[in-house]
């Protein structure tokens, strides 16, 4: 039975960095599959070393694509897939996820030899497409990546609303720090407000940018660093976590009042 994890968060908050690094950490002991569910299609770049063709692009050219044509192996033999999205201004951004999950299921990608499946999902809006990993029972547990910034937490609160509606299991909040004042306190109190907890704190580091410029994870490029160890600790915390809740999101006014308390 695979451990099936969905990582949600606002666009640009660092989901892909978190996902690729914990996947790299898991690869030492487990068979891992990473599925990028973001129209930017950049989740797996640091695992593969380049951008992958997306499932949407592949099926446009070949409707009956094989598993070998959509699944790629990267660092630590991590299997990687990118769902992709439409051209800007054309169609639903979540459609790529719908098409991808249908094809991957049909091709038998979710086989028993996969130990851990990680979905990297855009979470500014939990619309039909982006809700697929949860709604269609492709994932069992959800983690939200946020910083202590207003819009990141606003998106996190909206994601909690979607998780509650879908009756999914929230495993915790990951604080991907941006260096703002009282950041860890803000995120910790937010987690408590929605009935959850902070499961990991990742400080900002130049190593992240240096690694991403080289299209590598921090685990690969700076494997002996404290930053790499923090990703390994986060991976362990997620793997061993058994504390799940259906979150209770704040109302809009309550959220604004909560945030004003830190000004």
Swiss-Prot record:
Binding site for ATP: 9-16
Cofactor note: Binds 1 [4Fe-4S] cluster per dimer.
One term of GO molecular function: metal ion binding
Any one GO BP annotation for this protein: nitrogen fixation
UniProt xrefs under InterPro entries: NifH/chlL_CS, NifH/frxC, Nitrogenase_Fe_NifH, P-loop_NTPase
Cofactor(s) of this protein: [4Fe-4S] cluster
One Pfam family it belongs to: Fer4_NifH
Presence of the UniProt keyword Flavoprotein in the record: no
Gene3D superfamilies, per database record: P-loop containing nucleotide triphosphate hydrolases
Catalysis: reaction(s): N2 + 8 reduced [2Fe-2S]-[ferredoxin] + 16 ATP + 16 H2O = H2 + 8 oxidized [2Fe-2S]-[ferredoxin] + 2 NH4(+) + 16 ADP + 16 phosphate + 6 H(+)
Modified-residue entries (ADP-ribosylarginine), positions: 95
Role, per record: The key enzymatic reactions in nitrogen fixation are catalyzed by the nitrogenase complex, which has 2 components: the iron protein and the molybdenum-iron protein.
Subunit structure comment from the entry: Homodimer.
Record family assignment: Belongs to the NifH/BchL/ChlL family.
Name listed for the protein in its UniProt record: Nitrogenase iron protein 2
Source species of the chain: Methanobacterium ivanovii
């Amino acid at each position: 039975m695979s451990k099936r994890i969905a990582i949600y968060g606002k666009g640009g908050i660092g989901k892909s960095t978190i996902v690729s690094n914990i996947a790299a950490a898991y690869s030492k002991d487990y068979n891992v599959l990473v599925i990028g569910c973001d129209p930017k299609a950049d989740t797996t770049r640091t695992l593969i070393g380049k951008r992958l063709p997306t499932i949407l692009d592949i099926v446009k050219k070949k409707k009956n694509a094989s598993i070998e044509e959509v699944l790629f192996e990267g660092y630590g033999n991590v299997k990687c897939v990118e769902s992709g999205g439409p051209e800007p201004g054309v169609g639903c951004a979540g459609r790529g996820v719908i098409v991808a999950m249908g094809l991957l299921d049909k091709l038998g990608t979710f086989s028993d030899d996969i130990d851990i499946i990680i979905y990297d999902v855009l979470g500014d809006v939990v619309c039909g497409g982006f809700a697929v990993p949860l709604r269609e029972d492709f994932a069992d547990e959800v983690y939200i990546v946020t910083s202590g910034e207003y819009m990141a937490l606003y998106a996190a609160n909206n994601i909690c609303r979607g998780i509650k509606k879908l009756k999914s299991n929230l495993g915790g909040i990951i604080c991907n720090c941006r260096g703002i004042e009282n950041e860890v306190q803000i995120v910790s109190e937010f987690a408590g407000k929605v009935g959850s907890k902070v499961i990991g704190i990742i400080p900002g580091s130049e190593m992240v940018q240096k690694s991403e410029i080289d299209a590598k994870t921090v685990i690969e490029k700076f494997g002996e660093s404290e930053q790499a160890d923090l990703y390994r600790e986060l991976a362990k915390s997620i793997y061993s976590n058994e504390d799940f809740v259906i979150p209770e999101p704040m109302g809009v006014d309550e959220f604004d009042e909560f945030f004003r308390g830190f000004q």
